[in-house]
């Protein structure tokens, strides 16, 4: 597929990042469940703030950087392997590690419905954003559009988790998605120009919640 095939690229992004794509993203909250239990996120405003913080300064930003680097390195087996190693090393908790690796494995398996040589270049246990970036590049899907779709899917997943945890209603969730559009566009543009030197986060509360979720008693989510 050529980079000019806009409709084909859109259709593939919609398929790959749809909640119906069989990767199991619905079962992860990224520590939000613990933050809700601790009272740190208790309403729609708090959920919206949580989302924006992760986009600008947390795991969603770092994942976008990894995706962009994998997209640019999609034909370089060594670079993809090194990027995957770094992505796994920077997972902030055991659950976060399992989340990104299991989602990556599931994505690669499901993406085999669109055969391409890039699937053979990806290492085992490729983190989710690395897998998406490489596969999107292999199919000629533009980087910035891939980043925007990936970030939107990440926000949607968090919002869905917040709704299931009872801190926001469906109307609130839609409002958060609408309010996040400008931030998603901004972060996608920044990430498209990023290098691995731009990795970094400042979300101690979210990272700590992800760690503490491992010992949470009653829970709905795997992270």
UniProtKB/Swiss-Prot annotation:
Transmembrane segments: none annotated. Keywords: Chaperone, Cytoplasm, Nickel insertion. The keyword Chaperone applies. It is found in: Cytoplasm. GO terms for molecular function: nickel cation binding. InterPro entries: UreF, UreF_sf. GO terms for cellular component: cytoplasm. Gene3D superfamilies: Urease accessory protein UreF. UreD, UreF and UreG form a complex that acts as a GTP-hydrolysis-dependent molecular chaperone, activating the urease apoprotein by helping to assemble the nickel containing metallocenter of UreC. The UreE protein probably delivers the nickel. Required for maturation of urease via the functional incorporation of the urease nickel metallocenter. Belongs to the UreF family. HAMAP family: UreF. This is Urease accessory protein UreF. It comes from Agrobacterium fabrum (strain C58 / ATCC 33970) (Agrobacterium tumefaciens (strain C58)). The gene is ureF.
